[in-house]
């Protein structure tokens, strides 16, 4: 096996990508180079490096490289490898799974669905949407307007087989599965949905208005009212899209604000003259961070316009333009305006970035101070950067469950949240529950990230003692505190080392602990609701004669919940689930007509 120095001596002088690895073989940095030999050697020969780069170089124990034909190919490969490995020392954009997209699939009778993953599968993607509620609302409006399918049936194999699902009976789907809807007719509706999501909804409104007036002129007032309702729904989407230009130009306007620690980059997404989205990225400020951001952003974005508006020239601008042409098949131009509308939009983006940066700094300062006060209150020597908060609960003595919420680096890290369905005993026993949850968590270290600096238990001294006992038996010396609640289930005090520590209600520590406890409680309640819904559905249907496992699964697949089943008529249950009338009647009698 070659040593590091031998590998450095044998590096080629071609373009390519290099991957730096630590002692565990983990990729900690991915970079690109016009000349691999010169670039990689610089890390080990150059003394003029930033502190961050110097720290990274100390951890490099090995490296690999991939040769490419051109610098642009190296840029594309670098972006892909950064997404795959998410190295510690690279500029990392958001993890896409935290954001939702609306997707219109690329298949026979395309589906309208939400997704957290953008793939190169020929589908049309719109987003990202930060608000899950906004996505759900938009999907529901589009279903009511264009009645596109959301089911997972495979066509043409399942065309004309089986009955339509509930969406057909409540007029949220055309029921293409019946096999009597022409594909061309359906495709026109898909194109209209695409127009709405692309910022061209005004065209659809005008079409609907013409149709509404035609119905009214022919005294078909009910039909006219239906169209009017659709127009109102459509305008709810359109009003969120601010008009920027009188024409239908499309462009991305990108600007940033920075301080010594962070940079906030704002992307104003303008399509067909309307501002349809604003994206914000807060990153650690480092050399060339803006250029690195542009490379990653345009290596895998849902929609690329013909113009990209920037506040100044960037050294890699030409390569970014070439990368876009290679990836997306058309030329995009980077523009740096000196005056006019585009310059004003850059100022708007910068102002938004400045506000976000100030807010982030305010929140960071609050948490830094709160964590420092908490450290002093508990008398802990080390800094508190990661807190794990646990909740134990049960459903009337059954289904004992535990939940874990993680507060890390000043924010909740939902990627590390965990649910535990307790298996080692039956009945209600908080102490055994705490022991099982902590044992499972701390004997499976790889799935939970770094060790916490503090553990919070939603409970009193007994729960704290149980947690400490487990940790000591496993060789861990992690501080554990109990979150004591008042009669209204709100934070009162902390229990630590056998003492109840009084926390002032207006203190930063109280606000921090309350925030963590409320999030822990919210996550536990959400898990309980999922289990309760499952049990309620199973127990009610299990009591009905004529409902076996297959019918139960079918009813759940079609209606989704007892509430939806309760809202459906007997006739709708018969048609949608293809079951006898007398059994549908029994269902309604059991769950309440």
Curated annotation (Swiss-Prot):
Signal peptide: none annotated. The keyword DNA repair applies. Residues 13-91 form the GIY-YIG domain. SMART domains: GIYc. CDD domains: GIY-YIG_UvrC_Cho (cd10434). One of its GO terms (molecular function) is DNA binding. Disulfide bonds: none annotated. Residues 202-237 form the UVR domain. One of its GO terms (biological process) is SOS response. One of its GO terms (cellular component) is cytoplasm. The keyword DNA damage applies. Keywords: Cytoplasm, DNA damage, DNA excision, DNA repair, Excision nuclease, SOS response. Pfam families: GIY-YIG, UVR, UvrC_RNaseH, UvrC_RNaseH_dom. It is found in: Cytoplasm. Interacts with UvrB in an incision complex. NCBIfam families: PRK00558.1-5, uvrC. The UvrABC repair system catalyzes the recognition and processing of DNA lesions. UvrC both incises the 5' and 3' sides of the lesion. The N-terminal half is responsible for the 3' incision and the C-terminal half is responsible for the 5' incision. Belongs to the UvrC family. This is UvrABC system protein C. It comes from Caldicellulosiruptor saccharolyticus (strain ATCC 43494 / DSM 8903 / Tp8T 6331). The lineage of its organism: Bacteria, Bacillati, Bacillota, Bacillota incertae sedis, Caldicellulosiruptorales.
């Amino acid at each position: 096996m070659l040593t590091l120095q031998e590998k450095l001596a044998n590096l080629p002088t071609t373009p390519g990508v290099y991957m730096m690895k630590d002692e565990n073989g983990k990729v900690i940095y991915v970079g690109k180079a016009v000349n691999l030999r010169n670039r990689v050697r610089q890390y080990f020969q150059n003394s003029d490096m930033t502190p961050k780069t110097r720290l990274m170089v100390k951890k490099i124990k090995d490296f690999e490289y991939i040769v490419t034909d051109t610098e642009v190919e190296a840029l594309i490969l670098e972006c892909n490898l950064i997404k795959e490995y998410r190295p510690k020392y690279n500029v990392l954009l958001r993890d896409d799974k935290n954001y939702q997209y609306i997707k219109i699939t690329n298949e026979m009778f395309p589906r309208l669905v939400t997704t957290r993953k953008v793939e190169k599968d020929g589908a049309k993607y719109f987003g990202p949407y930060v608000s899950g509620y906004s996505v759900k609302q938009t999907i529901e409006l589009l279903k009511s307007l264009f009645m596109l399918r959301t089911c997972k049936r495979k066509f043409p194999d399942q065309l004309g087989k089986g009955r339509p699902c509930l969406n057909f009976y409540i007029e949220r789907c055309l029921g293409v599965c019946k096999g009597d809807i022409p594909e061309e007719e359906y495709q026109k509706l898909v194109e209209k949905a695409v127009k709405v999501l692309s910022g061209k909804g005004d065209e659809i409104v005008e079409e609907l208005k013409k149709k509404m007036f035609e119905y009214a002129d022919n005294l078909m007032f009910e039909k006219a009212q239906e169209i009017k309702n659709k127009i109102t729904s459509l305008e709810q989407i359109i009003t969120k899209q601010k008009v920027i230009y009188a024409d239908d130009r499309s462009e991305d306007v990108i600007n940033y604000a920075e301080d010594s620690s962070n940079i906030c980059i704002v992307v104003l997404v303008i399509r067909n003259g309307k501002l349809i989205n604003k994206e914000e990225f807060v990153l650690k400020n480092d050399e060339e961070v803006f250029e690195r951001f542009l490379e990653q952003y345009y290596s895998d974005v849902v929609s690329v316009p013909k113009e990209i508006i920037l506040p100044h020239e960037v050294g890699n601008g030409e390569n970014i333009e070439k990368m876009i042409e290679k990836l997306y098949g058309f030329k995009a131009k980077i523009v740096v305006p000196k005056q006019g509308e585009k310059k004003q939009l850059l100022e708007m983006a910068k102002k938004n970035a400045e506000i976000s940066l100030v807010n982030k700094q305010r929140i960071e300062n609050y948490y830094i101070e709160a964590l420092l006060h908490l450290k002093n209150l508990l008398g802990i020597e080390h800094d508190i950067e990661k807190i794990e908060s646990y909740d134990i609960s049960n459903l009337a003595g059954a289904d004992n469950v535990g939940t874990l919420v993680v507060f890390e680096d000043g924010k909740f890290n939902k990627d590390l949240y965990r649910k535990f369905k307790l298996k080692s005993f039956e009945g209600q026993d908080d102490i055994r529950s705490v022991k099982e949850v902590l044992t499972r968590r701390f004997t499976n270290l790889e799935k939970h990230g770094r060790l916490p600096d503090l553990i919070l238990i939603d409970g009193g001294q007994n729960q704290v003692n149980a947690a400490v006992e487990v940790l000591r038996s496993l060789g861990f010396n992690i501080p554990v505190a109990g979150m004591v609640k008042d009669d209204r289930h709100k934070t009162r005090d902390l229990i630590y080392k056998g003492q109840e520590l009084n926390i002032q209600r207006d203190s930063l520590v109280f606000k921090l602990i309350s925030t963590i406890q409320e999030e822990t409680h919210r996550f536990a309640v959400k898990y309980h609701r999922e289990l309760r819904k499952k049990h309620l559905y199973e127990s009610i249907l299990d009591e009905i004669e004529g409902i076996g496992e297959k019918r139960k699964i079918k009813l759940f697949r079609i209606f989704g919940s007892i509430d939806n089943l309760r809202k459906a008529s007997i006739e709708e249950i018969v048609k949608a689930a293809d079951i006898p009338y007398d059994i549908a009647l029994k269902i309604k009698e059991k769950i309440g007509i």
